[in-house]
Amino acid sequence: MTDFRRLFLSVFIAFLLIFSTPSAYSLPLPITENTSSEFLNLGVDQMRRGNYNKAIENFNQAIQLQPDFTVAYSDRCLAYLQLQDYYQAVTDCTQAINLATENVEPYLNRGLAHYRQGNYLAAIANYNQAIALKPDDFRAYYNRGLACAGEGNYPEAIANYNLALTQIPQTTSLPLANIYNDRGLVRFELQDFAAAMLDFDLAIRLNPQDYRAYFNRACACGRNGDNFGAVRDFSQVIRLNTSNALAYVNRGVASYRLGYHQKAIADLQTASEYFGHQGNRVAYKKTLDLLKSLRQQIQLATEIA
């Protein structure tokens, strides 16, 4: 049977918009510094509003007036990350690092750009630098864990997630949930389903509104043969994210295995409609093929009976 299982990966980077704080001088500040700082602040404001192209325009002005403005390069890097222009993000982070080698943020963000490009080894190298500069920053361990998982080095990924858990403030429930969710994914890949379930349970307890952990726990239930648990969790995914076609497919498969044939057919029909509306032609065709196969199997079972 077609395996529609998809596990979700959550990348957490605390994008820190950096503000420049003018130092106290006995003499008036140069006009250029004031103006560049104003452009920087305008850019930061546009970032907060989600206007990333406008933010870049302001950061460009700040850099034109002050070519060694480290903060402007760092913040422009963040804007490019949001626009998924990873080449420019790497370029700006590199310039920020050249201007201030002891600043952790550009290493974290350049690592993220490399990670999203699929260049996991380069990402790991940047996170190593960040950890050397700031050994108590959980983000570097967590992101290095993600990159290790991308490389398929699951034991090292788990080790980094564990280190992140030792450094993260226990009051930050959403980042904690992400770490447990991603550690659960790695344990799932290692077929340690019991440990994966425990991590997904913790992720759900910390963030009960995140459908991804329910989806992942449902997949683990299915692999354990717990189709009732799979139906329960896929149903919760659908309650939280009504257009999640994959959840309908997987709930349909679990329902079929439980003998609820009409519910299975209804879910697959709904899934095909969502895939069609979303323009996902490959998934749409595969769902129709699966629907046809299930109907044939149901008909055959009826004839034999």
Task: Describe the role of every protein-language-model region.
Residues 2-305:
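Alpha-helical tetratricopeptide repeat
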